[in-house]
From Swiss-Prot:
Protein name: Putative protein tag-250
Signal peptide coordinates: none
Keywords associated with the record: Repeat
Residue runs in coiled coils: none
CDD domains per UniProt: Tudor_dTUD-like (cd20379)
Gene: tag-250
Record organism: Caenorhabditis elegans
Length: 610
């Protein structure tokens, strides 16, 4: 596959069922937009930016009419256009004339496959899939409205999601194997499909039924059964995970039709039941932390896992409110009774990512127990802890092709809790620095409107009150004054640096050697900014993982890897921009035209800093 082809996205709109406007006015709009993209945005453009440019160049000058509300659907109904939705962003592309259509399936978190098919679906097949999309989601939702029979008084349960003692979700331990099996079975089903096809289980944005049941693949590649709570907005759907209790927004591209009702996946109702304890609203707010302490166990690495409890009471007699439950610990302790007992110290809880996450709502703290009299210790993750196959990650900092900081997506939402706890701890009087920081010691520093964990490197040679620090969770150096530094809580469960470093593999500078141009550094940074926080797929290449070697920087894991984001391989993109060469390509002569290549502006997406 050529570098340019590698940048072509998948087509997401189902053109067979769309009502295409073939009026003269709409055809004129298509022609204008086609020329705009072809001339100004040959590598694609965000639909919102294209709309703004169209209005600026044509509508405001009286040269064209306003775009209709469904203009994206109407434009992409034509074969000359292709579109890709990533989160809230729709990116439009055009096909050059006299070329065949190239389609790529949605990007998988683990691997990338390109599959094509020449068979046209029959009329009966199209009718059947249309009926499935219209009827099955509603019918499946009725099935999932029923609860698993394993959830009853006397059963062993765990809390899989919690807002407070007044609202949380429980799941029977007996259902855990079935829960894992459903995810595995769904993965096998969708792996056998050969998209893009009018007959696969993908669902277009206008086909989502509010209240309907679907399958959903999260950023880690795991499949779940969900209910679409609302119609899609900005390309995303609010989904309730019926077997976990979580409610989150996900892009339409991650959603599929569930198997037919006769399939074993649909033989069991929802496994997570929303319940409450017999406490008042006031007690619920006051007892949040204690509730988490009693029902979750914090491991040495800060990860919280739910404790197995016995469902000793289940009262669903009041149909207008949530069932009232009580839970017992292994030693027969009633959680409700213990919650209401007066207690001395309530420690700072740190809900972090588990297989069943607790939301930040449960992380409010009424009192903090922290120790600042001992030095804090923070260690990098080891090379052995890093994945060997492709995995999704968040981009944090990008200095250039050889210095990119990322964090495994599987660690979310742990960083959110870590930063929230760090903010609370730095507000305590005991965290104030009474003397100069120790070189090599770990501290907190207020940088870019946020408290960051840092390692103090040395004093500034210009400002005696400033210090050079290394941001442990960002991977960059910064200067900060002493008054903006705090001591770290030595009892904090967050003992690891979550960041790792990466170098883009398979490419080299166009001028040869190891030095990259200033333009290539800027392009890498702008690439990730344009992605608006979308996950990056990291595919490590040989020789695998090693330790980052930079003077005064921690030895965090690092690797050379292929990186892709929003369906684009950044290495291929740099090559297409004339900023890099394939690793095995010969170095062009100084007068070579390739060294004089015009560098196009990256996709103009309203982005944010990474």
């Amino acid at each position: 596959m050529s570098a340019v082809n590698g940048l072509v996205p998948s087509t997401i709109f189902d053109r067979i069922n769309s009502d295409m406007d073939v009026s003269e006015e709409m055809e004129e709009i298509r022609e204008v937009l086609y020329e705009m993209i072809k001339t100004n945005f040959p590598m694609g453009v965000a639909a919102t930016h294209l709309s703004e440019k169209y209005h600026e160049e044509f509508v405001s000058k009286g040269l064209g009419r306003e775009l209709p509300e469904d203009w994206i659907q109407q434009v992409t109904a034509a074969e000359e256009f292709e579109a890709q939705t990533r989160g809230p962003i729709t990116i439009l592309f055009v096909r050059l004339s006299n070329t065949s259509s190239f389609k790529r399936p949605p990007i998988n978190s683990v691997n990338v496959r390109v599959i094509s098919t020449d068979r046209e679906p029959t009329a009966d097949e199209l009718k059947k899939i249309k009926q499935r999309k219209e009827n099955e989601p509603t019918e499946h939702a009725k099935t999932l409205s029923q609860q698993s029979v394993a959830l009853k008084e006397g059963s062993t349960v765990s809390i899989v999601y919690a807002d407070s003692p007044k609202r949380f979700f429980i799941r029977a331990l007996a259902d855990d194997d079935q829960y894992e099996k459903i995810g595995t079975t769904l993965a096998e089903i969708y792996a056998q499909e050969t998209p893009p096809s009018a007959l696969d289980s993908r669902v277009a944005i206008y086909e989502i039924v509010a209240g309907g049941a679907y399958a959903l693949q999260d950023s880690n590649g795991t499949w779940f059964r969900v209910i679409a709570k609302q119609p899609p907005q900005s390309g995303q759907v609010m989904c309730h995970f019926v077997d976990v209790g979580v409610c989150e927004k996900f892009p339409v591209a991650a959603i599929r039709l569930l198997p037919p009702a006769v399939h074993p996946v649909m033989s069991i109702g929802s496994m997570a039941r929303e319940v409450r304890m017999d406490v008042s609203e006031e007690e619920s707010l006051r007892l949040n932390n204690k509730f988490v302490d009693l029902t979750f166990e914090t491991k040495d690495d800060g990860i919280q896992v739910p404790i197995n409890l016995t469902l000793s009471k289940f009262d669903s007699s009041d149909s207008e409110s949530l069932p009232v439950v009580d839970l017992q610990s292994s030693d027969g302790l009633s959680i409700t009774e213990f919650l209401k007992k007066p207690s001395g110290v309530v420690r700072l809880s740190t809900p972090t990512k588990t297989t069943s996450p607790i939301t930040p709502a449960s992380a409010s703290t009424s009192s903090l127990t922290c120790l600042f009299d001992k030095p804090a210790t923070i260690q990098p993750m080891t090379v052995a802890q890093m994945p060997m196959s492709a995995f999704p990650a968040n981009a944090i900092f990008a200095a250039g092709p050889t210095d990119i900081s990322l964090r495994q997506l599987s660690l979310d939402p742990m960083p959110d809790y870590m930063y929230a706890k760090l903010k609370d701890e730095c507000a305590l009087p005991d965290s104030q620095l009474e003397s100069s920081p120790d070189f090599g010691g770990f501290y907190a520093a207020f940088i870019d409107d946020r408290w960051e964990r840092v390692q103090c490197i040395r004093a500034s040679k210009i400002d005696k009150q400033a210090y050079c620090v290394y941001l442990l969770d960002v991977g960059a150096f910064q200067y900060v004054r002493k008054e903006a530094m705090r001591r770290l809580n030595s009892t904090s469960p967050f003992k690891k640096m979550l960041m790792f470093k990466c170098k883009i593999g398979g490419i080299k500078p166009v001028a040869g050697g190891e030095v990259w141009s200033r333009e290539s550094h800027e392009a890498v940074r702008e690439f990730f900014e344009a992605a608006c926080g979308e996950p990056v797929v990291v595919e490590p290449t040989q020789p695998g993982w090693s330790q980052w070697k930079q003077l005064n920087a921690p030895a965090v894991p690092t690797c050379e890897a292929r990186l892709s984001c929003c369906g684009r391989d950044i290495g291929d993109w740099l090559i297409a921009c004339g900023l890099a060469l394939p690793i095995n390509a010969p170095i062009p002569s100084p007068n070579s035209q390739s060294l004089l290549t015009f560098v196009p502006t990256p996709i103009n997406i309203v982005g944010r800093n990474i």
